[in-house]
Amino acid sequence: MARSTRAKQRLRKGRKKVNQDHLSVKKLTVAAVLMAMNIIMSISALSIPVPGGHMYLNDLIIVTAAILLEPFYALLVGGVGAFIGDMLFYPAPMFVSLVSHGLQALVISLFVHRWMKSRPVPASVIGAAVGLVISVTGYTLGRAYIYSTPAYAAAKFPFQILQTLVGSALALLLCWKCGVVKLYEREFKRG
């Protein structure tokens, strides 16, 4: 009798481990797809020309990833995805992108998944607002340093705010009004 009970317990532990591994693979796959989308959004052909450069829609993907994914995965999608995109298409600000978008995604995800877990919609809005400040500040300081001209950074400043604001607003609408969060959660509850 004791042997069969132990065998059942081992079997349950084994099933639980398989399910956890399956979830990890699924989360990694979602993160990889979002990272690929982030890289693709770095193409200048998909951007809007503005004085001082281009306005990209990366923030839509970064904020969406941060709302859906745990902080580690969000950091990878935001920071590493933007870094690779810049490295492939315009390498000068790639380290600025790594830090700015990485911190932006990390902070949003921490608000949603750790600090205000019981209230995800307000957490997303607050996180996106804080992420906007991080991204805009990081890019403004980074551009001033990289290009050695604060005037260049100042010229791009309002468009950087607009880029992050539009991307964040679209991500919030996509996640909460269009049901992406519910779809994502339903898929992961199913295992």
What is the role of each PLM region?
Residues 1-191:
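Loop-helix junctions at membrane interfaces
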